C-alpha cells in the first residue's frame, strides 16, 4: 500500500522539525505589543489596543507542479489565498489584506497574467486588499515557480474564538470541500503519474480529467463563516488541511472529537485510494475527504449553521460530536480524534 511518506511527505517528521525550530525562539518585545496565547493554533496574533492583529502565511505546495504540467496557472493563486484566509477565520478574525511572494526560475507575460487573474479572483472572494508583494527571479535556486502569501486579519480581543469552550455534547458541522484543495498533492501525483502512468489530460473513471480535479481551487470559507460567527454562538473552527481531522486537536485538547456521520466521500478520493491501494487511515490522515472546514456549536445552533452554509451554496452536515472520552477496544481514550468509516474506527494521531 502506498503512503504519503512514500510520496516524500512525512507529516510526523514535519511536526518534529517545527518543534525543533520553535524551541530556539524565545525573544519577545518588552512593551505593550504582546502576542496572543495561541501557540499551536491556526494563526498568530499580537495585541493592538482593543484588537488582535492576526497573521497567517502559506503557499500552494506541489499543486504548482500540476499547474506547470497543465500550463494552467489561474487557479493556484486562489489556493494560496484560501490557505491563508481559511486559517485566519479559525480564530474568528476577519481577513483584510494580503502580500504575496513569487519566486521564479523564469516566467512569461502570459503566466504572469494568469496568476494576476487568479489573485484578483481570490481577493474578491475573500473581500481583502492586495497591498504589495515581491517577485524574485532565482534561476540558480529553484525550478519552476513557487507562490506564497501572508494575510493580515483583525479581531476584537473580546471576540476571539480559541476553541477552549468546546465541550461534551457540542456537535461538529462539516462544510463541503470543493475537492482535493491544497493538501495531499504529492500523494495524488504519485498515484496518478507514477503508479497509474496517467497524465493531466487523462480521464478518470467518472469522466473528469486529472487536471480538472487536481486544479479545482480550494474553497474560500470567509464569507459564510464570518456570517455564522455573527448569527450563532460558534465555539470552535477548524480548517481541514494537511493531517485531515487531526487539525481538530488545535482547539480544546482536553476533549475528544468523534466523527461518525460523514457524507458520501467525493469520487476524487475514491479514485486515489483505488488506483494507489491506499489504506483508509492514510487517506483520512492525508486528505480532507470531502470536508474542508468544521464549525463546532451546541446542538441547538447546528441547524442555523447548516442553513447559513446552504445560503452560500456550500452543503453542510452534522458529522460528529464532542465527547469527554472515547472507548476503543475496551480502552477509554482522551484528547483524541476518532473517525468511523466503513465500519472501522480510526484514531487520528
UniProtKB/Swiss-Prot annotation:
Question: Which pathway does it take part in?
Answer: Purine metabolism; IMP biosynthesis via de novo pathway; 5-amino-1-(5-phospho-D-ribosyl)imidazole from N(2)-formyl-N(1)-(5-phospho-D-ribosyl)glycinamide: step 2/2
Q: Which GO terms describe its cellular component?
A: cytosol
Q: Which UniProt keywords apply?
A: ATP-binding, Cytoplasm, Ligase, Nucleotide-binding, Purine biosynthesis
Task: Report if keyword Phosphoprotein is assigned.
Answer: no
* EC number assigned by the record: 6.3.3.1
Q: Which domain of life is it from?
A: Archaea
Q: Name one GO biological process term.
A: 'de novo' IMP biosynthetic process
Any one Gene Ontology MF annotation carried by this entry is:
phosphoribosylformylglycinamidine cyclo-ligase activity
Catalytic function, reaction form: 2-formamido-N(1)-(5-O-phospho-beta-D-ribosyl)acetamidine + ATP = 5-amino-1-(5-phospho-beta-D-ribosyl)imidazole + ADP + phosphate + H(+)
Q: Where are the transmembrane segments?
A: none
Primary site of residence = cytoplasm
- Which InterPro entries does the record cross-reference, listed alphabetically? PurM-like_C_dom, PurM-like_C_sf, PurM-like_N, PurM-like_N_sf, PurM_cligase
Q: Which enzyme class, named as a word?
A: ligase
Location in the cell reads: Cytoplasm
Q: Which PANTHER family match?
A: TRIFUNCTIONAL PURINE BIOSYNTHETIC PROTEIN ADENOSINE-3 (PTHR10520:SF12), TRIFUNCTIONAL PURINE BIOSYNTHETIC PROTEIN ADENOSINE-3-RELATED (PTHR10520)
Cite the NCBIfam families for this sequence. Answer: purM (TIGR00878)
Family label: Belongs to the AIR synthase family.
Q: What is this protein called?
A: Phosphoribosylformylglycinamidine cyclo-ligase
Please spell out the taxonomic lineage of the organism that makes this protein: Archaea, Methanobacteriati, Methanobacteriota, Methanomada group, Methanococci
